[in-house]
Amino acid sequence: MLERNFQAKLKKELKEMFPGCIVTKNDANDIQGLPDLTIFYKDKWATLECKKSANEKKRPNQEYYVDKMNEMSFSRFIYPENKEKILNELQQTVKS
């Protein structure tokens, strides 16, 4: 599965999981390494860096921004192999 296809399906799933949320696609050309998606739900926010598989190479600065944003709120690398785990973690974080 291509990353963009995984990302499109994930966006739909997030909108179903968190009714009324806003999911934005971040511009990789603006800040290199910034996670792909930002999710705003009620008074919470999270970012997700989408990968087409667990083996896909990380690009420069991605690890840095995922770690930094995770310290601020919630941020993870997400791919088909860990999607359910990450979405469960996100749900627990957002609903707390």
Predicted features and spans:
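Catalytic phosphate/metal-binding cores of nucleic-acid and nucleotide-processing enzymes, i.e., regions
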Residues: 1-96
